Amino acid sequence: MRKSFKDSLKALEADIQFANTLASEYPEEYDGGYVQMRLSYSPAAHLFLFLLQWTDCHFAGALGLLRILIYKAYVDGKTTMSLHERKTSIREFYDVLFPSLLQLHGGITDVEERKQKEICDKRYRKKDRTDKGKMSEIDLEREEECGICLEIRNKVVLPTCNHSMCINCYRNWRARSQSCPFCRGSLKRVNSGDLWIYTCSAEIADLPAIYKENLKRLLIYIDKLPLVTSDPNLVPYAPLPR
């Protein structure tokens, strides 16, 4: 059953708050600032309040009545709010920004967990342990293969849908199409600098540096979003009257 506007708006607010919590864990090196997001809606949203009650906030976002503004915050409490902000849609938030932050957070957690498992395994493993639970060499090779050319090459991951392929196949495919070859998701806003780096188990020691690079790519993606100027159709978000 479709959520009401009020319920879907509460869910969106909660997701943005969670995304802000995740983003606060990744301050930039040169100034210590970190990405934060807030809702902004058009004054016309009040005029359409009655209609909005029967839809969800995604519909309001598609009509341009609701946007997400991105700014930077600092540990001293200062922000670039209303001074230097970029805008994005609810769809881009759920398709790119939120999944990217979740992937960064989950990836670092996975790295720490795998390192702890490796330490325990080396310390307490038995000499007669068999390889029954290990993947075969053929399975490992298939895991590293590009899904298009079936060659074992360094792969990249599309930030919009998380499908992976080797960089050569990506370039060849992108020259002919603007959609993912696996799910047909749009790649119109995805450039080579936005791609994530696919890592295998042999590269576990370098994962922290790679996640740092992935954070850099996420920030580059944000920097390409439209800059908010003096747009009268975008005003600070406040709860709509009941």
From Swiss-Prot:
<keyword id="KW-0833">Ubl conjugation pathway</keyword>
<dbReference type="GO" id="GO:0008270">
    <property type="term" value="F:zinc ion binding"/>
</dbReference>
<dbReference type="GO" id="GO:0009737">
    <property type="term" value="P:response to abscisic acid"/>
</dbReference>
<comment type="function">
    <text>Possesses E3 ubiquitin-protein ligase activity in vitro when associated with the E2 enzyme UBC8 in vitro. Plays combinatory roles with AIRP1 in the positive regulation of the abscisic acid-mediated drought stress response. Plays a positive role in abscisic acid- and high salinity-regulated seed germination through the ubiquitin-proteasome-dependent down-regulation of ATP1/SDIRIP1.</text>
</comment>
<keyword id="KW-0963">Cytoplasm</keyword>
<dbReference type="GO" id="GO:0005829">
    <property type="term" value="C:cytosol"/>
</dbReference>
<keyword id="KW-0863">Zinc-finger</keyword>
<dbReference type="GO" id="GO:0009789">
    <property type="term" value="P:positive regulation of abscisic acid-activated signaling pathway"/>
</dbReference>
<dbReference type="InterPro" id="IPR013083">
    <property type="entry name" value="Znf_RING/FYVE/PHD"/>
</dbReference>
<dbReference type="Pfam" id="PF13920">
    <property type="entry name" value="zf-C3HC4_3"/>
</dbReference>
<keyword id="KW-0862">Zinc</keyword>
<feature type="zinc finger region" description="RING-type">
    <location>
        <begin position="146"/>
        <end position="184"/>
    </location>
</feature>
<dbReference type="GO" id="GO:0009651">
    <property type="term" value="P:response to salt stress"/>
</dbReference>
<dbReference type="GO" id="GO:0006511">
    <property type="term" value="P:ubiquitin-dependent protein catabolic process"/>
</dbReference>
<protein>
    <recommendedName>
        <fullName>E3 ubiquitin-protein ligase AIRP2</fullName>
        <ecNumber>2.3.2.27</ecNumber>
    </recommendedName>
</protein>
<keyword id="KW-0346">Stress response</keyword>
<dbReference type="InterPro" id="IPR017907">
    <property type="entry name" value="Znf_RING_CS"/>
</dbReference>
<dbReference type="GO" id="GO:0061630">
    <property type="term" value="F:ubiquitin protein ligase activity"/>
</dbReference>
<dbReference type="InterPro" id="IPR001841">
    <property type="entry name" value="Znf_RING"/>
</dbReference>
<dbReference type="GO" id="GO:0004842">
    <property type="term" value="F:ubiquitin-protein transferase activity"/>
</dbReference>
<keyword id="KW-0479">Metal-binding</keyword>
<comment type="subunit">
    <text>Interacts with ATP1/SDIRIP1.</text>
</comment>
<keyword id="KW-0808">Transferase</keyword>
